[in-house]
Amino acid sequence: MTNIRKTHPLMKIVNNAFIDLPTPSNISSWWNFGSLLGICLILQILTGLFLAMHYTSDTMTAFSSVTHICRDVNYGWIIRYMHANGASMFFICLFMHVGRGLYYGSYTFLETWNIGVILLLATMATAFMGYVLPWGQMSFWGATVITNLLSAIPYIGTNLVEWIWGGFSVDKATLTRFFAFHFILPFIIAALAMVHLLFLHETGSNNPTGIPSDTDKIPFHPYYTIKDILGVMLLILVLMLLVLFTPDLLGDPDNYIPANPLNTPPHIKPEWYFLFAYAILRSIPNKLGGVLALVLSILILVLVPFLHTSKQRSMMFRPISQCMFWILVADLLTLTWIGGQPVEHPYIIIGQLASIMYFLIILVMMPVASTIENNLLKW
């Protein structure tokens, strides 16, 4: 009798994706972040579901409903902080996952990579709308500033912004629709993640060397299931350290002040995981130019496969490209720092230089480094 996991229509899908999946024998811990993102998504959907049971998406009661969750609902405080800090863990894993893809040349799987970029955009949209829901000062002003950016679109901009707002300012209609979208998007993300996996399993995983590993594959279970469980345990450990010891470390104190349209906070800034893009937006003195730079800072990932000039896939044996990659990482950390600083000297010029460097490294320096390395191979 054949094993049920290989014959049952549903079990067969699970088996081919998580049990008998042929996997390269040498993939490192950098390949753990895919499964960690899956865990983060499940965690966010579950905690979010329980929060939605007690939350009210009305401007008059939203802030107090979040307070009610933290004070009066059984374990409401831990659910709320797991959800808020879970988003931070989600983005840490996302950035690591994308960084791994860039370093080891995983972007040559075009369909997988492009769906990954769509997933990144969808996750950013979800996180932004979730940040608006507690209806604190930073929620309100963040929503006002970011949605207002669309008014930079020529001709239709103003109409588009008012259409998104559902009125002439960020108000009840905006909050209600953001709650609706914030609830539905994670399920769309889950569906897209399935498609992401589907395309990945068409080609099989990449590995640190970037060399095809068809001659040396091992089953996913037990080798990588146990490795993933270790990753998940570390993720939960870090998350719970954050939640139980410093739950507000990554948040903004201004969000504990109820939203007030008549009082602008001194420094409007998004959550830490958007600061790099926010710094790029602010570094251009022109509104439309800033918006374009903001969008391109993420969409530039779509161009990466076409900018790959190297004869080798991975950066493992390419020291000049490695150097460029780590300069890019340092540049992104600089942008993240600048995004949280006020708009004054010397932060303005640092932000502008870091923004120029960001695009220069990806569009010019990395392809040039690859070409130099190709020529060095001939020596």
Curated annotation (Swiss-Prot):
CDD domains: cytochrome_b_C, Cytochrome_b_N. The chain crosses the membrane at residues 33-53, 77-98, 113-133, 178-198, 226-246, 288-308, 320-340, 347-367. One of its GO terms (biological process) is mitochondrial electron transport, ubiquinol to cytochrome c. GO terms for cellular component: mitochondrial inner membrane; respiratory chain complex III. GO terms for molecular function: metal ion binding; ubiquinol-cytochrome-c reductase activity. Heme 1 (or BL or b562) is low-potential and absorbs at about 562 nm, and heme 2 (or BH or b566) is high-potential and absorbs at about 566 nm. This is Cytochrome b. It comes from Capra cylindricornis.
